[in-house]
């Protein structure tokens, strides 16, 4: 999770431990430097899905925040631990060596902020995106008009699809578009 890959040889095995000697240590720069997902809180199963797929696609920071219409339940310690286990599994799956962070508040980002907006026709995200970037995605029930106005002042209103997407689908498709533009 710190951009290092170690090769090791097992030197001893006991009933409860294995001891290793590191024989090679290599550093790998992250392929994506800053891709932030600011997602209104979701139900736990959907949150886990977004964390798994977002990690595989290159999200560097997850910010799950309260909105007026989002799931207001704060995850338990066990649920947070499960999210970290999901991240580790996703890192192994995609070969990433940099561990994304999780925060439970809105980010203080001010560069390349893209707000997934359903209120009217907007520019498609793939036409205007660049990294570093922050993608703001709403909850299952959407944002209130006050929240929409606030986010429109922060950044660019964009469309992710000509269709109305589920919150987790919007997050994943937006991240995929941003990550693809980083290549």
Protein language model features and the residues they cover:
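Structured adenosyl-cofactor binding patch, chiefly the S-adenosyl-L-methionine
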Residues: 145-183
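Glycine- and other small-residue-rich loops at beta-strand/loop junctions that grip anionic moieties
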Residues: 39-40, 140, 163, 167
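Short, solvent-exposed amphipathic alpha-helical segments in soluble enzyme
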Residues: 53-57, 129-131, 150-153, 174-175
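N-terminal positively charged helical leader segments and presequences
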Residues: 1-28
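Active-site/ligand-binding-proximal alpha/beta "capping" segment
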Residues: 113-148, 155-160
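RNA substrate-binding interface of SAM-dependent RNA methyltransferases
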Residues: 27-112
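A short acidic, often aromatic-flanked loop/helix-cap motif at beta-alpha or helix-coil junctions
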Residues: 105-111, 121-124, 164-166
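Short, glycine/serine-rich, charged loops/turns that create anion-binding
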Residues: 42, 69, 120, 140, ...
């Amino acid at each position: 999770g710190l951009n290092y890959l170690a090769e090791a040889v097992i030197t001893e095995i006991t009933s409860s431990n294995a001891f290793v000697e590191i024989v090679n240590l290599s550093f790998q720069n992250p392929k994506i430097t800053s891709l932030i997902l600011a997602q209104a809180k979701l139900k736990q199963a959907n949150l886990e899905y977004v964390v798994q797929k977002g990690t595989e696609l290159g999200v560097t920071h997850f910010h799950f925040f309260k909105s007026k219409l989002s799931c207001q339940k704060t995850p338990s310690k066990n649920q947070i631990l499960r999210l970290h286990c999901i991240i580790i599994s996703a890192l192994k799956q995609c070969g990433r060596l940099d561990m994304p962070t999780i925060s439970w508040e809105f980010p203080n980002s001010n560069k390349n902020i893209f707000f997934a907006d359903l209120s009217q026709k907007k520019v498609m995200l793939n036409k205007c995106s660049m990294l570093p970037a922050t993608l703001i995605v709403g909850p299952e029930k959407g944002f209130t008009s006050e929240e929409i106005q606030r986010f429109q002042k922060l950044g660019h209103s964009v469309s992710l699809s000509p269709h109305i997407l589920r919150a987790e689908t919007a997050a994943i498709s937006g991240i995929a578009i941003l990550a693809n533009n980083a290549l």
